[in-house]
Amino acid sequence: MATTFGSPSGDSRRGVASPRPKGREAKNTFCRNVTIYGHCRYENSKCRPPHLPDHVLNQNENAKKRFNVDSPSFTPLTTTPNGSVTASARNAAISPKAANAAVFTPKSQRSAVSTPNLHNKEPALDWHAPDFQEFVPETFGGPMVDSNASASYSGYDPYTSSANLASIAGQGHQSSAMNPYAQGHSGLEASYYQNPSAFQTSPAYHLYWPVGPQPTSLLGYQRTAHDFFIPDALREDLQKRAEVARQVMPNSTLPVIEQFHSLFCLDTTPQKNNAPFGYVSWIYKAISGKDGKTYALRRLENFRLTSEPAIRSAQAWKRIFNGSIVTIHEAFTTRAFGDSSLIIVTDYHPNSKSLADEHFKPMQRFNGRQATSSHVPEHVLWGYIVQIASALKAIHGSGLAARLISPSKTLLTAKNRIRLNACAIMDIVQFETARPVAEAQADDFVQLGRMILCIANNNTTAHLQMQKSMDHVTRNYTARLKECIQWLLNPQPPLGTPSSPTTPAPGSKDIDNFLGGISDQLASVFDSELHAQDTLTNTLGRELESSRIVRLLVKLNMVNERPELDASQQMSGGNTSNPSSVWAETGERYYLKLFRDYVFHQVDANGHPVTDLAHVLDCLNKLDAGTDEKIALISRDEQNVLIVSFREVKRGLEIAFQDLIRAGRGQGK
């Protein structure tokens, strides 16, 4: 049956009224009009589904607000006497709204609080930028190092950073901390605006490539490239000494003292120290204008000379020449520094350091913390004792006393090679209050024993805890060394008691008895020095004829490319003035040109230059010996090939060089 448009029917009523719920779980479904529009116009007439109560609607609206006056107040948990939380308190502390709380998002992972999107079908992969610690300018701090330890033993190391040298270039030796935030060339811009007076660091000679494994299948007459040069360790040491000796301070404000100029301060710390002379002392490196040699100048600030014989007491030290004493050359006073200063001129030993720097200086490689030092071998200690005893023999034999034997005033100039430094200073400073010579000589033995005891214990204050220090010596060294140290530390014994460290013969405590007691150690140290001398002699002998290579190079470069010599000879003989043809392709000296190209201008199969030191040394050695080995000399255009021997090349080179000498003599040169 057909119906007209708009006529009532049974299905038209179903589209106007609320949908009829179906199923048994539909009884708990509330009206959708309330959830969508907030109210239902058919609530009292036609709508069948149940509606939400008013207090529930108000609660949902209040939940959307940020501040709600109906929210429960904060109630802290209450604990029982035994410390446990009661069940009622635990239940009251958790709100029913906690189930609907949003997921916690840390603040560091989100830059801003964003509203969650309820209609996302796929989880969004948001990228959260990590938070960085905010930079807060603070005081520019230095390295974590003990200031007392670093100030006590801060020796001179020419191969470390030279930042501290600029602060000691002037007279005041004052240092100022760098401000990294200051505007100007003195701050962080110093790396781009270099100061022309900055100290130049030395080349890294110690970074040379070491000698690799040596082939063992060489014949008796075969050599490697390293056999033609001195050992790397000796070469590096000599190069470091030469580099240190040539160090200067550009734009230095240090004055010229007498004939000494180009002063360079060797103290790397600007802190003043009055010990042990009683005056603030500095040490400089200077060049003498008389002989051009380098000397060390020790300066004592604010020294007032009250007696002329005091300064003349250094004349006796100038007559002492001993290998274990730093030689003294001159002593005088000056006002070049703006005050009355005492200057002691001594020999300069480059790249040397004191025994305090060698054995007691904190290791800077472990963040400024002093690392556990290695055990000092006993033969090293005996070497120190023998060398100081040799110095005391020369000093006491001249009627003088060292008066100052300490690790900070004993120089280590080479491996296990020490020298007494700062001699004659105490004689000048304490001239009026000087002790008797015999008493001062006896005190030299005590100071020597203290120094050896401190080095053996690796502690500068070991002599203050005598029993503990001697126990350490007993555990780590032989009884012979312990007996020697005890003899040195004991005071002057009365007459008729044993005085030698090994022999019970009575006598006074002097240097002769001491040398007699350590005679066996004298022989051991002397034998070691002989072996070291033999090694240096063999190394020097290896370099004896190294100049013959230079002589060949000089001859080749003087003879080659000299056609004007032959032209002048022909002019004097009345022949044609054209250049001689001896250097032409058919000349008798043409092979000298080809030999030069054969030795120095080698190329590979692709025409690339080849720099082979072994080939150059091999050819020059064979040329110097004049062997009969034949070589093929090829011209640069590869059109001429000459087969000659090294003997023929050597003979032609000598003839050409003799002609050059005769031509020079003929012109009066």
Curated annotation (Swiss-Prot):
Q: What is its main location?
A: cytoplasm
Give residue spans, biased composition: Polar residues.
1-10
Which keywords annotate this record? ATP-binding, Coiled coil, Cytoplasm, Metal-binding, mRNA processing, Nucleotide-binding, Zinc, Zinc-finger
| Domain of life (superkingdom) | Eukaryota
Extract the ranges annotated as region (Disordered). Answer: 1-25
Q: Cite a GO CC annotation.
A: P-body
Compartment annotation:
Cytoplasm
Q: Quote the function comment for this protein.
A: Regulatory subunit of the poly(A)-nuclease (PAN) deadenylation complex, one of two cytoplasmic mRNA deadenylases involved in mRNA turnover. PAN specifically shortens poly(A) tails of RNA and the activity is stimulated by poly(A)-binding protein PAB1. PAN deadenylation is followed by rapid degradation of the shortened mRNA tails by the CCR4-NOT complex. Deadenylated mRNAs are then degraded by two alternative mechanisms, namely exosome-mediated 3'-5' exonucleolytic degradation, or deadenylation-dependent mRNA decaping and subsequent 5'-3' exonucleolytic degradation by XRN1.
User: Protein name, please?
Assistant: PAN2-PAN3 deadenylation complex subunit PAN3
Origin species: Phaeosphaeria nodorum (strain SN15 / ATCC MYA-4574 / FGSC 10173)
